[in-house]
């Protein structure tokens, strides 16, 4: 009963919030200004800055990134003059903010770091945390903080619940939507510095020359915001695109084909990030098709990328069609390969051993592999947590993970994006909080869910305590509510077949994998579980 009351209470609170916004004068969606329709996210609306009274000082050539930083300050800063200064403050894109009665100084070794410092200052202003003197020093825990888009060439998004793909491939490279820059701005504001543009179930055509020219157009938009582009690649591309007879990673012609293709990419996009690969999983081709290991496949691609500084993110989401317990499959396949991957390969592992369930133990690979670079893959889109219909604040899920897996065990962090063409970007206003929380935790995994929710609410809606306090409480309890109704008694896979929305504990599909069916987990005896097969 307690769980039912909590769920009903959350629904009532959502209704109260909506009613309150309407009473405040909110018009229907198709008539709302940007301040109210969700399109501005948690950021100030950008307005013309000509004649702005804010004084920003930068002694040096104003690059596109510095121009963005200056524009953000002139648009929203309400304090003393700001000095931006490139000065060594630590490694990577860290920054320092200091102040006196007459000036605020933002220092960083990099231009991207200065931009992050600007967004941090504006975040503190929105939260009412700017005091004199200021003394803030921040350093990102992970150098790579990457969104993974499961976007397809036809404009659909796998497990997407916020409209169509943000990327209008048919209009690129000639037409650039203003949302591309707005997307880059939102990512930079929370420290996200990379994006994989396409689905891990990748089409070989993404590597065709015409497609790469479209990717270049996006990379050019994102670059001033410190964001690199990456691509998911199909391991069989040498066969399907290059017309070779094989994709064997040890074949000389295959190696030559990949090296030529990588050279073509870097000629167009000098700061290209690298490849994300889903191989030998759910029907996708991979090195195992040719009697090779995951390490041999990943290393071949890594060798092609290394002269340009590129990386390979090789997914560990694999399971054998003949084994009924997929929870152990990634461990069985990757643990024997520990220490065999090249230094520019990162094994990308889902946070849990099953598949983004509302609650899972962490994957054992995170603590077992000692000689391999690893990164965690979270799912920001709510495949198993109510799509974009349910309020489910996911920071507690990720905070739970970082409480078990030491951040220094990881090299990078990835999140499967929840972004689409909906006017509010994420299909549900509160789903924006998960995009925001992912970026903040990827920058600093020691942040609390409470603090992140507080930041997001104050920047997105209002700082009034009468609003922030109850709505934050609702957010902080929402994930546990989803766990209780999606995983009763800790049982997973009680959801509907295929789309994963809503309950279907009676599900029985002839010929389906036993571990995809509810009966495997709910039947009282081995004999009954056998019937699910």
Model-based region annotation:
Residues 2-10:
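Bacterial N-terminal signal peptides that target proteins for export
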Residues 9-20:
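Bacterial N-terminal signal peptides
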Residues 24-104, 109-112, 130-133:
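Acidic, contiguous N-terminal accessory segments
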Residues 63-72, 90-94, 98-274, 306:
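Feature activates predominantly on carbohydrate-active enzymes
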Residues 171, 243-454, 460, 464, ...:
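Catalytic-core regions of glycoside hydrolase
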Residues 521-530:
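Conserved small/polar residues in nucleotide/adenosyl-binding loops
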């Amino acid at each position: 009963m307690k769980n039912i009351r909590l769920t009903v209470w959350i629904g009532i609170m959502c209704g109260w919030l909506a009613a309150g916004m309407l009473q405040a004068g909110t018009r229907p969606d198709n008539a709302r200004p940007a301040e109210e329709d969700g399109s501005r996210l948690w950021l100030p609306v950008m307005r013309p800055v000509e004649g702005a009274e804010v004084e920003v000082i930068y002694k040096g050539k104003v690059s596109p990134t510095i121009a963005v930083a200056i524009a953000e300050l002139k648009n929203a800063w309400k304090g003393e003059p700001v000095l931006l200064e490139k000065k060594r403050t630590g490694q990577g894109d860290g920054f320092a903010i200091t102040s006196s009665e007459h000036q605020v100084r933002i220092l960083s070794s990099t231009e991207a770091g200065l931009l992050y410092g600007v967004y941090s200052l504006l975040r503190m202003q929105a939260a009412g945390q700017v005091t004199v003197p200021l003394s803030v020093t921040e350093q990102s825990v992970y150098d790579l903080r990457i969104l993974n888009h499961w976007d397809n060439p036809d404009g659909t998004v796998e497990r997407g619940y916020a409209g169509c793909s943000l990327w209008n491939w048919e209009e690129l490279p000639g037409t650039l939507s203003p949302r591309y820059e707005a997307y880059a701005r939102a990512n930079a504001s929370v420290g996200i510095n990379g994006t994989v543009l396409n689905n891990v179930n990748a089409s070989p055509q993404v590597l065709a020359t015409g497609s790469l020219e479209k990717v270049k157009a996006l990379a050019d938009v994102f670059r001033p915001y410190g964001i690199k582009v990456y691509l998911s690649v199909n391991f069989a591309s040498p066969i399907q695109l290059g017309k070779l007879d094989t994709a064997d990673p040890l074949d000389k012609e295959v190696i030559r084909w990949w090296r030529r293709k990588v050279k073509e990419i870097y000629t167009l996009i000098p700061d290209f990030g690298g490849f994300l690969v889903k191989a030998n999983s759910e029907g996708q081709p991979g090195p195992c098709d040719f009697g090779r290991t995951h390490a041999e496949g990943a290393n071949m691609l890594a060798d092609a990328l290394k002269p340009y500084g590129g990386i390979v993110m090789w997914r560990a989401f694999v399971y054998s069609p003949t084994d009924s317990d997929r929870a152990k499959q990634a461990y069985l396949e990757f643990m024997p390969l520990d220490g065999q991957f090249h230094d520019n390969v990162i094994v990308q592992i889902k946070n849990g051993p099953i598949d983004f369930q509302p609650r899972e133990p962490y994957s054992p690979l995170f603590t077992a592999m000692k000689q391999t670079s690893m990164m965690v893959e979270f799912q920001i889109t709510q495949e198993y947590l109510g799509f974009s219909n349910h309020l489910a604040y996911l920071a507690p899920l990720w905070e739970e993970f970082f409480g078990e897996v030491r951040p220094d065990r990881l090299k990078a962090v990835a999140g499967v994006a929840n972004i689409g063409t909906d006017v509010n970007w994420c299909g549900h206003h509160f789903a924006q909080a998960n995009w925001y929380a992912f970026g903040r935790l990827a920058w600093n995994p020691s942040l609390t869910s409470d603090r992140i929710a507080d930041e997001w609410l104050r920047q997105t809606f209002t700082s009034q305590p009468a609003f922030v306090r109850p709505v934050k409480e609702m957010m902080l309890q929402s994930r546990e509510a989803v766990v209780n109704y999606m995983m009763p008694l800790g049982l997973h896979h009680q959801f509907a077949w295929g789309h994963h929305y809503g309950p279907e504990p009676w599900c029985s599909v002839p010929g389906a994998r036993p571990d995809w069916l509810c009966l495997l987990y709910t039947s009282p005896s081995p004999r009954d579980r056998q019937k699910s097969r």
